[in-house]
């Protein structure tokens, strides 16, 4: 196992665990609060969980040296809107269970990557077809995703984030 892939997997697991811990501690009222983009906290937690498989699919394409084609921010926004409509009332238990399941699967996939695969680069349509590495995709999407939404959730429920050393 690569030290780099292990470090990435640990960071993903840490973010997912922090998100699950926060979600579990929220009151029913906090669970239903809208974040800045209008989605409820409950929907955001489920969204992060549901995106891990898609984000990993794209990262694994780059790991294999294959381009990511046809994925645009317009498409991402459409996926998010559809998800909001379908999971606007998802239960806390369901969202947290999916978060734990999908983050564990994503971490396992990351751990299986070699340094060579992490360094493979190919055009990524989501980023103007820039030739980006698998590691960049992992850091910018599945690893960062939970932290990004944690900040939004903490802001809406009035919690202050205290950065911790890695």
Where are these regions (language model features)?
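Short amphipathic alpha-helical segments at helix-loop
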Residues: 1-4, 36, 84-91, 130, ...
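Alpha-helical bundle segments that constitute or directly flank the non-heme di-iron/ferroxidase center
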Residues: 2-28, 50-61, 140-147
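Active-site rim elements
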Residues: 4-6, 91-96, 138-139
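Hydrophobic alpha-helical segments and helix-packing faces
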Residues: 5, 12-15, 37, 41, ...
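Acidic/histidine-rich alpha-helical segments that form the ligand environment
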Residues: 11, 79-120
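Internal, well-ordered alpha-helical scaffold/interface segments
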Residues: 17, 42-46, 97, 104
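Charged/polar positions within long, soluble alpha-helices
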Residues: 21-24, 28, 53-60, 104, ...
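Short, contiguous alpha-helical
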Residues: 32-78, 121-166
